[in-house]
Amino acid sequence: MKHLKQFLLMAMLLFTLAPLQVSAKENIDVKEILWGHIKDSYEWHITKVGDHPVVIHLPIIVKSSTGWHVFCSSEFSEEKDANGDRPGPFNLVIKNADAQANPNKIVEKVGDQEVRPLDISITKTICVLFIDAIILLLCVLIPARWCRKHKVDDPAPKGFVGLMHMFIMSVYTDVIEATLGKEAPKYAPWLLTCFFFIFVANIMGIVPFPPGGGNLTGNIACTVFFGVTTFLITNFTGTKEYWKEIFWPEVPTWLKVPVPLMPFIELFGIFTKPLALIIRLFANMMAGHAIALSFAAIIFIMFNISENAIANYVAGTGMTIVSVAMSAFMMLLEVLVSYIQALVFTMLSAVFISLAHVKSHEAEPEVVK
């Protein structure tokens, strides 16, 4: 409890003194702060020392009209041109965030036209993806190594291996096996991968400094991959009875012909299930990051609310106490949400897969009156 009080005191002092460096006449763009954390980027912004940002420059790999080019993102100028773009080598520029076409993306200027080159650069999101994948491999391979060296009747593992063993078995037993039954071993690798990757990505997104801080599950491309993969597994492994119930369900005939109302609804449901997985995970994680950043941005706004420095300091200090308390609460809530979202995604994926394994309806036993 004593250490918790010291931590909260240091946090309040940090949030109180940091905004004092901001000029009272400087406008705080909350939208830029929020989207700067959520959106993808060719560099990893860490902090700002005075007027100099501290960033990790990432590799740029593009194929333009002049061929393949590999260089560092630091080659792009920090000074923006008349259009608000950041010029770089080989007639390449990074478009500004407010551009109607390709915002924050690399384009090639060919005469008066702007052409989007083949871009396979290692962006912030890709870098976070690699880091989370490495952490996930370590979390799985270390317990796997222990299992290979021990017998089934050996004492239960302790420490990190014991924690991961408990985690894996709880998800497998309570979610996957309880939903899929005998089919559980077949789909357990994918469902366990979904749970642990989403959970690791969510937890790493809460960490405010590298290698954390990336909002991977708040990126629609990441959630689309998981949703589409579950969609493909569900439908390509479905039974004949599953497809029969979609195109010719056991409902009154007038609901199927001449207007195929129920088949259309069932077919539409095939696509809404993965869409629900995608939107639920994306929206929840992006909203959590946005709310946490909003509490921090309120401090800077209150320190620049008027021209009176004393009034700004009083308002900012008072809001700092409230903001730090709410931010701490949101961080704890984000940890809980990180687990819940990973569990819900895995559970719904298992349910959707189980619904595709419909067996032939057996004849009901006759009831003796």
Residue ranges, per PLM feature:
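Perimembrane topogenic segments of multi-pass inner/organellar membrane proteins
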Residues: 2-6, 20-158
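Alpha-helical transmembrane segments
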Residues: 4-11, 130, 187-191, 219, ...
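Membrane-interface helix starts
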Residues: 6, 179-189, 283
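Bacterial N-terminal signal peptides
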Residues: 10-19
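Cytosolic juxtamembrane amphipathic/interface segments immediately preceding
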Residues: 115-117, 169-183
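Juxtamembrane interface elements at the cytosolic ends of transmembrane helices
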Residues: 138-176, 238-245, 360-361
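Hydrophobic alpha-helical transmembrane segments and adjacent short intramembrane/lumenal linkers
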Residues: 192-196, 200-207, 217, 221-225, ...
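Membrane-interface helix termini and inter-helical loops of multi-pass transporters
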Residues: 209-213
